[in-house]
């Protein structure tokens, strides 16, 4: 029997190993770590009949004991698709596969909505899944957040969850790169700004990966308010376009937009419902509303069903999540803002003046827009984590006139921010890191959860 090796015991690796085992394939999992978490995961898989080897680095020699039977190696999105070891295995004729492609093969009898973009994809994923579910369509979400695609496939194929009508999948550039055959029924592209350049090298390479998903989608939906997508519209696949503002005379046509009276309009069908049915703040959420409306309409929902779903949406954890108020300011958790552009968009939605907590593991990118929003809205910035010194220098060079504080971690940052909010009579206190979380946290969710816990003693009750 041929063998598939799964690399890594992360969320994707666990799902992939279990799915392959369920399909009757011989599987071995290789994991470089040897800590308590890895040991616990390994014991669980071994009890299920899956072989796990710990302390095995991703090197070509690590595969030697299984070379005679090795047919394929499966990797999750955390491993670069062009890793030298993977390239070496390719040259030897070994298939290199992404976890997302295993899930696609197992679930391509169900229509997919594939949602990608630098920012906005998590909100659109949550919102579309909710709107469809509210209308009685079984449309679970997963992929780049929540349940891994392979784990979702396993639960469906085992009959542990009902077979969905649709799958609403958030797809990162890493997953798209590793899923060249993934072809959703509907593809949605929310935004494109420089991100993950440490991995992809250039903006052009990053854009091409995102574009490939939309090219393979039966229907493509684009955000016409995004500067990069709009500039590249002539080269993009024909599809549907949404714009939050009414199209001007010289603008390319839009399929959905919001008119001057605040009503969502459809090119085919006319007035639908007031945009204010979605309570989430910010111009970017009007774009998200339109992308979801376009997809839901294609799936078969009418205007009333879409409006009811939007109106009942509770929001997305860690994305401008309103935690309540201190005695003087509204508190928002925007831990999902892991780059400058996402952080700038969050700031735009805030009532100023704002005390901002920022920091973590910095990324390559253009900080100009973020710095402009800080200068416009923020009365104080509290920096924490590994990137605090770098961000401090960036902010001071921008001639920012507000207070700048620097500390080691989020706990210290919250104490400073709460004090500054009171002293400066700020209207809002916002965690908006503009950085990845991996310097001090497992992921942005853990960072946001910690912020929520740290803020709890300071929140106003009653």
UniProtKB/Swiss-Prot annotation:
Pathway: Cell wall biogenesis; peptidoglycan biosynthesis. It is an enzyme of class 6 (ligase). Its main location: cytoplasm. PANTHER family: UDP-N-ACETYLMURAMOYLALANINE--D-GLUTAMATE LIGASE (PTHR43692:SF1). It comes from the Bacteria. Its EC number is 6.3.2.9. It is found in: Cytoplasm. It catalyses: UDP-N-acetyl-alpha-D-muramoyl-L-alanine + D-glutamate + ATP = UDP-N-acetyl-alpha-D-muramoyl-L-alanyl-D-glutamate + ADP + phosphate + H(+). Pfam families: Mur_ligase_C, Mur_ligase_M, MurD-like_N. One of its GO terms (biological process) is regulation of cell shape. Belongs to the MurCDEF family. GO terms for molecular function: ATP binding; UDP-N-acetylmuramoylalanine-D-glutamate ligase activity. The lineage of its organism: Bacteria, Bacillati, Cyanobacteriota, Cyanophyceae, Synechococcales. One of its GO terms (cellular component) is cytoplasm. Keywords: ATP-binding, Cell cycle, Cell division, Cell shape, Cell wall biogenesis/degradation, Cytoplasm, Ligase, Nucleotide-binding, Peptidoglycan synthesis. Cell wall formation. Catalyzes the addition of glutamate to the nucleotide precursor UDP-N-acetylmuramoyl-L-alanine (UMA). This is UDP-N-acetylmuramoylalanine--D-glutamate ligase. ATP binds at residues 117-123. It comes from Synechococcus sp. (strain CC9902).
